[in-house]
């Protein structure tokens, strides 16, 4: 038994998990941000698959992977390296900011101050100060030394906030000395603060669409901005105005990188182009490369002869930068300036495929997916594993081929946002306890021929996901009773991430299946797991059965004029139609049939005697025939499948019954 903490004000919760390999060495979706530690050549990449990965850029080997940093469960939008590369700060769509030990790759602490997606970070190196901003219109300032000193007992942190933003913030920048901080938003303006006093200094107008990227000059006097309106603007903060508008892209500018002397702009755009432009002379520009997809982020390589670029795709490429040569002698004896050739791909960190399409099969146990490389895969949702790699086959044809004529209620939803299948269980629009099936249909490998068992998919899966959870303060089991963990049928991979989150809101808890046995994880689960989870996992309560009302009446071919009675019955929706046949044979015909020359008391004996003469050992479905909508019903179908595929009406399901030829019934 467990006394579970309840909170009336707690928001509705959902549980989700990811079907994936134990170690995902490749990004499975676009990469939003890059940070390079030039001291050791480590490149940190923030993925839309919720994973931060670390790469060795000093090796020429194709195997550059070092490690993964996992604790987010949604897109990682931005990262910054701090403390000379010892720590890393990350911002995510899961509404959190996380502090990491960059060398060992583990999450040190999680900041939950934001109320919506955290889109951008800014870093003042000289002050070890980080700012975070996002769709909640809020900007928070953090002291990095304080963040890295947080422990389980010393977990209180104070933050300053910058107020005044009126719309979602998508970009943020600070100069190294931390004297200027600039934000860009869907308000289409730049707002400037002094982070030392948190005072607003000014706002700058000029862009006509969202401001997606920003860079502040080291002295804090200039700002360069890129916008979805396709322009790059240079702003003089002393003059409080735009001093240069640069048109080099056909679509939105999403990433900016400046040369050390703040004279050249490297820009990446939705038009897939990466371009170098001289800031004071915008006509002096050259194309670095055309990427395969819209460019999301840019970062220098170690010696700054090349630029790393990320896109909507999962590959990370390094391109050689062209150099601006002012020492070319022209035909008239003067000096020309020209760009040396660039645009050569000098390195590539290959990414994996992102799942783009998904179909849930009618049995509601398997899903079929198609990824960005047209590979089709079958996943077993119940066992949380990849079941079959089908290759580049016809996705729609495969779904059609594998779909059976069976109806199981939806008990989960699938989210493909990270590029990997995330399965969501809840109690809102889709009830995770709605799928009751016979064990023969759901787990044929576990069938006991001596028993007739019904299983609930959602219950079994939650028990497997939380198999290792032993709640604190739980009463020890009776010595005569086994201490039951798991579901008794199967286990799921121990590396599976399990996430508890508010419905449509922030993440509350994330852990791996195997980690639920830990003291801190167990306590956290006790505090956050919703009652509907503990009811089945801890209390071992059985989810309620869903019932279907239906009518049962004689078929016109066997009914005499005086026999038109229509019975209304209610049964569990997973009951197979053979059970209805048994009811007709044992209850309806026996109770209401009076064979000629006999009386009601011996009607069952007479009907059974007739049946015996024709082979009474046959099961009920061999003697009784059910009809629905003028279609003979397969006795193996359950009630919900008949209602879905044959009845197809909102009114109560109606069956008609009649006897088969091998059953001699006098009422025919």
UniProtKB/Swiss-Prot annotation:
Coiled coil location: none
Deletion phenotype: Viable but sterile with reduced lifespan.
Gene3D superfamilies per the UniProt record, alphabetical: YVTN repeat-like/Quinoprotein amine dehydrogenase (2.130.10.10)
WD repeats: 26-65, 71-110, 113-152, 164-203, 206-245, 248-287, 290-329, 350-389
Residue segments, region Disordered: 592-616
Keywords from the UniProt entry: Repeat, Ubl conjugation pathway, WD repeat
Pfam families in the cross-refs: DUF3337, WD40
Alphabetized GO MF terms: deubiquitinase activator activity; ubiquitin binding
GO biological process: double-strand break repair via homologous recombination; negative regulation of ubiquitin-dependent protein catabolic process; positive regulation of canonical Wnt signaling pathway
GO cellular component: nucleus; peptidase complex
Summary of the function given for this chain in its UniProt record: Regulatory component of the Usp12-46 deubiquitylase complex. activates deubiquitination by increasing the catalytic turnover without increasing the affinity of deubiquitinating enzymes for the substrate. The complex deubiquitylates the wg/wingless-signaling receptor arr/arrow, which stabilizes the receptor and increases its concentration at the cell surface; this enhances the sensitivity of cells to wg/wingless-signal stimulation.
Subunit structure, as described in the record: Catalytic component of the Usp12-46 deubiquitylase complex consisting of Usp12-46, Wdr20 and Uaf1; regulatory subunit that, together wtih Wdr20, stabilizes Usp12-46. The Usp12-46 deubiquitylase complex associates with arr/arrow; the interaction leads to deubiquitination and stabilization of arr/arrow.
Family of this protein: Belongs to the WD repeat WDR48 family.
Protein name: WD repeat-containing protein 48 homolog
Organism the protein comes from: Drosophila melanogaster (Fruit fly)
Organismal lineage: Eukaryota, Metazoa, Ecdysozoa, Arthropoda, Hexapoda
Gene from which this protein is expressed: Uaf1
């Amino acid at each position: 038994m467990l006394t579970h903490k309840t909170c009336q004000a707690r928001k509705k919760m959902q549980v989700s998990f990811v079907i994936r390999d134990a170690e995902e060495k490749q990004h499975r979706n676009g990469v939003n941000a890059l940070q390079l530690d030039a001291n050791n050549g480590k490149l940190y990449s923030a993925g839309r698959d919720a994973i931060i990965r670390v790469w060795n850029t000093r090796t020429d080997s194709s195997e550059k992977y070092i490690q993964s940093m996992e604790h987010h469960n949604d897109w990682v939008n931005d990262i910054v390296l701090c403390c000379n590369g010892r720590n890393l700060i990350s911002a995510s769509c899961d509404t959190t900011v996380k502090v990491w030990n960059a060398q060992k790759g583990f999450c040190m602490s999680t900041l939950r101050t934001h109320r919506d997606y955290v889109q951008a970070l800014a870093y003042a190196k000289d002050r070890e100060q980080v700012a975070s901003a996002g769709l909640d219109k809020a900007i928070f300032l953090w002291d990095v030394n304080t963040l890295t000193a947080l422990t389980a007992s010393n977990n209180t942190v104070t933050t300053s906030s910058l107020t005044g933003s009126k719309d979602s913030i998508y970009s943020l920048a600070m100069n190294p000395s931390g004297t200027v901080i600039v934000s860009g938003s869907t308000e289409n303006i730049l707002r400037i603060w002094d982070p030392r006093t948190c005072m607003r200094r000014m706002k700058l107008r000029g862009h006509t669409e969202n401001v997606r990227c920003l860079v502040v000059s080291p002295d804090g006097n200039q700002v360069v901005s890129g916008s979805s309106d396709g322009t790059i603007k240079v702003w003089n903060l002393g003059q409080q105005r735009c001093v240069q508008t640069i048109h080099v892209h056909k679509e939105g500018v999403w990433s900016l990188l400046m040369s050390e002397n703040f004279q050249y702009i490297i820009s990446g755009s939705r038009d897939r182009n990466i371009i170098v432009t001289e800031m004071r002379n915008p006509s002096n520009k050259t194309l670095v490369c055309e990427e395969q997809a819209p460019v999301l982020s840019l970062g220098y390589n170690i010696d700054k002869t090349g630029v790393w670029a990320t896109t909507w795709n999962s590959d990370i490429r390094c391109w050689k930068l062209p150099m601006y040569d002012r020492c070319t002698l022209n035909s008239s004896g003067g000096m020309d300036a020209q760009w040396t050739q660039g645009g050569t791909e000098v390195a590539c960190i290959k990414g994996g495929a992102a799942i783009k399409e998904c179909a849930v099969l009618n049995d509601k146990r398997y899903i079929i997916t198609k990824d960005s490389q047209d590979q089709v895969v079958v996943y077993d949702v119940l066992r949380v594993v990849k079941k079959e790699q089908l290759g580049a086959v016809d996705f729609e044809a495969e779904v059609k081929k594998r779909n059976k004529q069976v109806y199981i209620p939806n008990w989960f939803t699938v989210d493909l946002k990270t590029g990997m299948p995330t399965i969501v269980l809840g109690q809102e629009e889709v009830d995770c306890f709605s799928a009751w099936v016979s064990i023969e249909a759901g787990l044929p490998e576990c069938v006991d021929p001596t028993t007739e068992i019904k299983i609930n998919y959602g219950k079994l899966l939650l028990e497997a996901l939380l198999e290792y959870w032993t709640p604190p303060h739980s009463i020890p089991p009776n010595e005569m009773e086994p201490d039951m963990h798991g579901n008794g049928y199967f286990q799921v991979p121990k590396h599976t991430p399990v996430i508890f989150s508010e419905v449509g809101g922030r993440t509350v808890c994330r852990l791996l299946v195997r980690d639920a046995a830990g003291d801190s994880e167990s306590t956290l689960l006790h505090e956050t797991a919703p009652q509907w989870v503990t009811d089945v996992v801890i209390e071992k309560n059985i989810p309620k059965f869903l019932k279907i009302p239906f009518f049962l009446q004689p078929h016109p071919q066997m009914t005499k004029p005086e026999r038109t009675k229509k019975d209304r019955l209610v049964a569990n929706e997973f009951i197979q139609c053979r059970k209805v046949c048994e009811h007709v044979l044992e209850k309806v015909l026996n109770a209401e049939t009076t064979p000629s020359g006999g009386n009601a008391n011996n009607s069952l004996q007479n009907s059974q005697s007739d049946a015996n003469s024709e082979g009474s050992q046959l099961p009920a479905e061999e003697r009784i025939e059910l009809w629905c909508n003028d279609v003979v019903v397969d006795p193996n179908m359950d009630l919900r499948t008949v209602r879905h595929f044959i009845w197809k009406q909102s009114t109560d399901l109606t069956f008609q019954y009649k006897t088969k030829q091998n059953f001699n019934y006098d009422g025919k």
